Amino acid sequence: MMTDTVDDVDLPYDKDSASQQEKITALQERLEVLETQNEEMRDKLLDTNAENNKYQQKLERLTHENKKLKQSPLFVATVQEITDEGVIIKQHGNNQEALTEVTDEMREELEPDARVAVNNSLSIVKRLDKETDVRARVMQVEHSPDVTYEDIGGLEEQMQEVRETVEMPLDRPEMFAEVGIDPPSGVLLYGPPGTGKTMLAKAVANQTNASFIKMAGSELVHKFIGEGAKLVRDLFEVARENEPAVIFIDEIDAIASKRTDSKTSGDAEVQRTMMQLLAEMDGFDERGNIRIIAATNRFDMLDPAILRPGRFDRLIEVPKPNEDGREIIFQIHTRKMNVSDDVDFVELAEMADNASGADIKAVCTEAGMFAIRDDRTEIFMQDFVDAWEKIQQEASDETEVSRAFA
């Protein structure tokens, strides 16, 4: 292919009449234009290559996904026995047993009761993780709550008992070994609503390095037979896998109420769930380095079987705070509040007679709302007085409504 000569190119000047300087200037201008065009074309080429690479990656991904979708599904089975002749497996669903050969490498990974994936010819393809209900796994708290013992007031004796029952066996097990006693296995917190039972459990989770697994008793109540019991088994299995661990069961009366002669299927399923919980708490399987905390507002409803020593060794009452406790709780909840110097916590504690910790927190929040309503950033003593009167009035109205519908 021949290159164009100067005579063949459309020159930006008249070659017969233009001077030498005009020719040079015109050619320089043409060169600048061509360089700009070349730069633009180079950028477009880079963009096109990048776009092409992106589509190429997408094509490879879709091809890989298409290949996976066309693969035959694998069946789930359980290893029954490992023999010299091979591995005996039982398929899930049809309970069909089969003897299959495995490689030496795969044989080392297998053990009885292990879950495996098998193909159409019942050859073991890979080992699967243990079957654990995902609902039990999501109950594990990854991040410690921000509640500490300093955030709890008026419960010094209860805090000491909880720490002895839960924290010390996890942090200093050698002390119990030297004394020659088994550490307490569980603690039950009971008392009126709003007295700080859940906060005590949160403080334990914050203080210990153990895995903290939280759940409500109502989460274990299920419609179909065996679901609640299975969730209890999986819950303790998750705790064993993450030892040391603390299991907190809130509102345990939902599954541990006194057994009756009721013949309804719902009551029977709740009782089966409780039986599984009792078996896990003191069954033949070693529970290991796992501590249990439970909380309830209805101690009178609990079944005696769950209260015996060995299941819950400590039954700790969490009462409403006394006057000194109420003063401390007021100080705790107002630490970050912009309170005036005229606020008298002793007088507030006397005023809020028979109030729970939750009531006091509500009073502090309502006092702040009164200040905001008056477009103030400082909270006065009168705001707390008005807040207490409002909380009392709301409680009185709720009582009247409940009586009307009783």
Swiss-Prot record:
Biological processes, Gene Ontology terms: proteasomal protein catabolic process; protein unfolding
Entry's transmembrane regions: none
Cross-referenced SUPFAM superfamilies: P-loop containing nucleoside triphosphate hydrolases (SSF52540)
One MF term in the entry's GO annotations: ATP hydrolysis activity
Residues annotated for ATP binding in this entry: G194, T195, G196, K197, T198, M199, H333
A Pfam family annotated for this UniProt entry: AAA
Highest taxon in the source lineage: Archaea
InterPro entries: 26S_Proteasome_ATPase, AAA+_ATPase, AAA_lid_3, ATPase_AAA_core, ATPase_AAA_CS, NA-bd_OB-fold, Nucleotidase_PAN, P-loop_NTPase
Keywords attached to this entry: ATP-binding, Chaperone, Coiled coil, Cytoplasm, Nucleotide-binding, Proteasome
Docks into pockets in the proteasome alpha-ring to cause gate opening, as annotated region: 404-406
Gene3D superfamilies per the UniProt record, alphabetical: 1.10.8.60, Nucleic acid-binding proteins (2.40.50.140), P-loop containing nucleotide triphosphate hydrolases (3.40.50.300)
Reported temperature dependence: Optimum temperature is 42 degrees Celsius. ATPase activity is 1.5-fold decreased at 25 degrees Celsius and 37 degrees Celsius, 4.7-fold at 20 degrees Celsius. The protein is not active at 50 degrees Celsius.
Location of this chain's protein in the cell: Cytoplasm
Knockout-associated phenotype: Strains lacking panA gene alone display relatively normal growth rate and overall cell yield, but they are more sensitive to growth on organic versus inorganic nitrogen sources and hypo-osmotic stress, they show limited growth in the presence of L-canavanine and display enhanced thermotolerance. Moreover, strains lackings both panA and panB still show robust growth, demonstrating that the PAN proteins are not essential.
HAMAP family registered for this protein in UniProt: PAN
Subunit structure: Homododecamer, in a proposed two stacked hexameric ring configuration, but may also form homohexamer. The hexameric complex has likely a two-ring architecture resembling a top hat that caps the 20S proteasome core at one or both ends. Upon ATP-binding, the C-terminus of PAN probably interacts with the alpha-rings of the proteasome core by binding to the intersubunit pockets. Interacts with SAMP1-MoaE conjugate in vitro, but does not bind to SAMP1 or MoaE alone. Interacts with NcsA.
Note: The biochemical properties of PAN 1 are highly dependent on molar concentrations of salt with a significant loss of ATPase activity and complex dissociation detected at 0.75 M NaCl.
Protein task: ATPase which is responsible for recognizing, binding, unfolding and translocation of substrate proteins into the archaeal 20S proteasome core particle. Is essential for opening the gate of the 20S proteasome via an interaction with its C-terminus, thereby allowing substrate entry and access to the site of proteolysis. Thus, the C-terminus of the proteasomal ATPase functions like a 'key in a lock' to induce gate opening and therefore regulate proteolysis.
PANTHER family: 26S PROTEASOME REGULATORY SUBUNIT (PTHR23073)
Name this polypeptide is given: Proteasome-activating nucleotidase 1
Organism: Haloferax volcanii (strain ATCC 29605 / DSM 3757 / JCM 8879 / NBRC 14742 / NCIMB 2012 / VKM B-1768 / DS2)
Upper classification of the organism: Archaea, Methanobacteriati, Methanobacteriota, Stenosarchaea group, Halobacteria
